[in-house]
Design a protein with these regions (language model features):
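A structural signal for well-ordered alpha-helical scaffolds and beta->alpha junctions
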Residues: 5, 16, 73-77, 123
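Helix-adjacent hinge/juxtasegments
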Residues: 56-94
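General structural signal for secondary-structure boundaries
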Residues: 1, 26-27, 65-66, 86-89, ...
Length: 147
């Protein structure tokens, strides 16, 4: 399971890094894309914090300047790799409160997979937003990454 999650987080790291690099090159990043990518970073931080049983550093829809994306992304990834490296049981159940204070329980593997799936979902929305703004989206499909 560790190898599987490390591969997925490598993919996530690659995709987010490419998207950050692309946005830095642009004269103007569409506002919706900035909101969505900030949300990806925030959610990743929030899920890591839930797993570790500590408070999150960011709010769900907090907007970050592009110049901060790389550092936030790196810290999120570092934390996730630490979680997967130290995990002894991926089926352990973890209790956490959502943003409204409701208690939920999920397995570690489901929480980790959600981070990846959630990020992929919103990167596809960013790709659509790029097209809507006459920008060329990146090819970030998993199969392209594995080639």
């Amino acid at each position: 399971m560790k190898v599987f999650f490390n591969q997925l987080f490598d993919y996530n790291f690659y995709c987010n890094k490419k998207l950050i690099e692309e946005c830095i090159k642009l004269d103007k990043v569409p506002e919706k894309s900035m909101m969505l990518f900030s949300h990806i970073l925030n959610a990743h931080n929030i899920w890591n914090a839930r797993i570790l049983g500590k408070p999150a550093d960011y709010k769900v829809w907090q907007i970050h300047p592009i110049k901060n994306w790389g550092d936030i992304h790196y810290e999120n990834q570092r934390s996730s790799f630490e979680i997967t490296t130290n995990a002894t049981d991926f089926e352990i159940r973890i209790d956490f409160d959502n943003e409204e204070g409701r208690l939920f329980t999920s397995t570690l593997q489901d929480m980790l997979f959600h981070i990846i799936n959630h990020s992929t979902h919103h990167r596809s929305q960013i790709a659509m937003n790029f097209r809507d703004n006459e920008l060329e989206p990146l090819s970030l499909d998993y199969i392209f990454y594995k080639r």
